[in-house]
Amino acid sequence: MKRSMYAGRVREEHIGQEITLKGWVGRRRDLGGLIFIDLRDREGIMQLVINPEKVSAEVMATAESLRSEFVIEVTGQVAAREQANDKLPTGAVELNVTALIVLNTAKTTPFEIKDGIEANDDTRLRYRYLDLRRPEMLENLKLRAKVTHSIRNYLDELEFIDVETPFLSKSTPEGARDYLVPSRVNKGHFYALPQSPQITKQLLMNAGFDRYYQIVKCFRDEDLRGDRQPEFTQVDLETSFLTEQEIQDITEGLIARVMKETKGIEVTLPFPRMKYDDAMALYGSDKPDTRFDMLLQDLTEVVKGVDFKVFSEALAVKAIVVKGAADNYSRKDIDKMTEVAKQYGAKGLAWVKVVDGELNGPVAKFLTGIQEELTTALALEDKDLVLFVADTLEVANATLGALRGRIAKELGLIDNDKFNFLWVVDWPMFEWSEEEGRYMSAHHPFTLPQEETAHELEGDLAKVRAIAYDIVLNGYELGGGSLRINQKDLQERMFKALGFSAEEANDQFGFLLEAMDYGFPPHGGLAIGLDRFVMLLAGEENIREVIAFPKNNKATDPMTQAPSTVALKQLEELSLQVEEDETNKTN
């Protein structure tokens, strides 16, 4: 029989109507001779009542056989509940069943189909199709669909053209590791799955599309964490003839639309702007969380004269003040924070507490001569905890930035109902890679340098600034973009600055350089991480919670067992041979 409506949409206006519902058995209760069933579908739960005096013996027997997650079809009359359940949208009504059919049975599930389960992540991913039945997971994916719908409508209104770009593309050496796909037809040659459609979308600007967008899958073979996956989705934009400000205005409008249509929140425009150097100096991060204070303080000059070489001889001494938290952190707690500091390259973590107007702690004796100056500089009050890092400026910033975020979570300083957006602008063009022993692109090698610093491409690369901009939300990089290079000579200079020979640049990017001979317009764009955006809107801490079928932290899928070995014949067709891992060899 045809389904009348979703179970979760039955309301008081349907009282007296005969309807047919289909879904899963959430729970069965036997009470006073009656059987009560919670019928669940994607829209919610509806209570069913099977009364032995009003149904056949066959229907009653079927009802008694029901177990959790059986799939059933029921027909009956909607009635008002004697005692309403205010916790359910359907709580004022119930269905008096007259007919019942079992469409499929189910084994006992490895975890309950409800919110707040304690199953481990791999178990949830192994049975992802069951995990997705849980209401909170279903709501997360429905939110994701609403977000993409809102984005498409907004960009369509602004006359952006949705264009699909290739998944089988060329491997390039910059950025994260590529996922490689061997070519059967062209032996020894490989495609790469795109880390982003960066070059192809730029070529679309050269083709005259003017405004492009795509909600697109991208792939990066990198170490995983809570806000990363090997395959992820981004909202990709590119425009011609627009300024940095105009691109940011479009992006702010997009985010404002999404926030209003999915969360009912009116965001204030324009978003604040913060220079990269200020973000690092004050927050210790290029993606600052501005929902709480605890800014980094530079004490390098203040402590120059103290009789403590760790401070007086350090390139930089910086501190954060944790207001009123002296009693919240024991020496053991601070030892744990010291271990965190070492993970960011710091040699240690110095600290003092303000107790009855005096400084207490391991380094307090070295600071007595500057206590008044220190108290004024840091606006110290009783019960404050001060954490110091003495090292290079980069290490001090990164360490205190990490501790700042950790402490704010521990002390509940963050208002989780806030959505603080901001732009981080005026980025360095290059960043030094210790692993590579050279400067690498901070964003990518197609970013347009600021005109007044472009001459340093042949000089001090640390001084080159980019016309680049990242959009940040609550301490997460939501997206980033830039104006792009459209002049061939400047692009060649950029490649040379990155250490490419002319031959290497032509081998890797010759098609782009050639395109620049044919009237390439000024252009720029941006990409927003859709998974991360939805994660933050949903109040989750891991993007796995807003992706239907994600990978685990080992980049594997416990359900399908991907990645897996393949048949020898498949490898032979690709002219590939797999070397056995030394750790798996037996003597």
From Swiss-Prot:
ATP binds at R220, D221, E222, Q229, E477, G529, L530, D531, R532. It is found in: Cytoplasm. Residues 198-201 are annotated as: Aspartate. Its EC number is 6.1.1.12. It holds the Pfam family tRNA-synt_2. Keywords: Aminoacyl-tRNA synthetase, ATP-binding, Cytoplasm, Ligase, Nucleotide-binding, Protein biosynthesis. PROSITE patterns: AA_TRNA_LIGASE_II. CDD domains: AspRS_core, EcAspRS_like_N. InterPro entries: Aa-tRNA-synt_II (IPR004364), aa-tRNA-synth_II (IPR006195), aa-tRNA-synth_II/BPL/LPL (IPR045864), Asp-tRNA-ligase_1 (IPR004524), Asp-tRNA-ligase_1_N (IPR047089), Asp/Asn-tRNA-synth_IIb (IPR002312), AspRS_core (IPR047090), GAD-like_sf (IPR004115). GO terms for molecular function: aspartate-tRNA ligase activity; ATP binding; catalytic activity, acting on a protein; nucleic acid binding; transferase activity. It catalyses: tRNA(Asp) + L-aspartate + ATP = L-aspartyl-tRNA(Asp) + AMP + diphosphate. The keyword Ligase applies. GO terms for biological process: aspartyl-tRNA aminoacylation. GO terms for cellular component: cytoplasm. L-aspartate binds at E174, R220, H443, R484. Homodimer. Catalyzes the attachment of L-aspartate to tRNA(Asp) in a two-step reaction: L-aspartate is first activated by ATP to form Asp-AMP and then transferred to the acceptor end of tRNA(Asp). Belongs to the class-II aminoacyl-tRNA synthetase family. Type 1 subfamily. This is Aspartate--tRNA ligase. It comes from Streptococcus pneumoniae serotype 19F (strain G54).
